[in-house]
Design a protein with these regions (language model features):
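Gly/Pro/Ser/Thr-rich low-complexity, intrinsically disordered segments predominantly at protein N-termini
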Residues: 1-199
Length: 199
């Protein structure tokens, strides 16, 4: 995901501090804002812009998924699609998500039943994505797989939910093909990092 700012921590003049929100107030307030905001059980976080390679990798993944799933009932969405995690009283904007749910396809503004979520890590959000955010994502009954892509190391960590409900880490190193079992897609490093310059 891109950089994440708690509005309470912004300097004066950058943005007006909103009141304490409940979920309905957040949903009514957010469409009128210039930037996207995530909602975490009453707290609101502004989603700052992401760097070039972050956006490029997200697009590469979404494009590969969209092509792969074109003849299926599944749909791929990027970071402008809001995801509700009801158990955490939260709304997020994942970098990429895939849903195969008829309920989600009928809901134009909010998805609730993703099969796959992918986050591209930023230095300011890596710990949050790996920790608190993943713990909330795991509460989604529909979620089968969660992938984290590290732009600096070019490693990808894929977490898969087993039949016993336990999540197992499947790490993929630099240059390795990433397997997304939930959608039966093998994603090569060339596809994943196309048009991304080495630092």
């Amino acid at each position: 995901m891109g950089n994440r700012l708690n509005l309470k921590d912004l300097p004066m003049g950058h943005a007006a501090q909103p009141p304490v929100f409940n979920a309905d107030e957040y949903l009514a307030w957010e469409p009128a804002q210039l930037d996207r905001h995530e909602f975490l059980d009453g707290e609101v976080f502004a989603m700052a812009g992401a760097e070039d390679r972050h956006v490029t990798v997200s697009m590469n993944i979404a494009f590969a998924l969209r092509q792969h799933l074109s003849d299926s009932p599944c749909r791929t969405y990027m970071s402008d699609m809001r995801l509700q995690v009801a158990a955490a009283n939260s709304y997020f904007y994942p970098d990429v998500l895939v849903t195969c749910s008829a309920h989600d396809l009928a809901s134009p503004l909010v998805k609730t039943e993703p099969k796959l979520i992918i986050e591209v890590l930023s230095p300011s959000t890596a710990a949050y994505d790996r920790g608190l955010k993943f713990s909330h994502y795991r509460s989604l009954p529909s979620l089968e797989e969660f992938a984290l892509i590290d732009l600096d190391t070019r490693n990808t960590d894929v977490y898969r939910k087993g039949p016993d409900g336990l999540w197992v880490l499947h790490p993929f190193g630099r240059g390795e093909t990433v397997s997304l079992a939930s959608v039966a897609l093998e994603l090569s490093a060339v596809q994943l990092f196309a048009d991304v310059l080495e630092l």
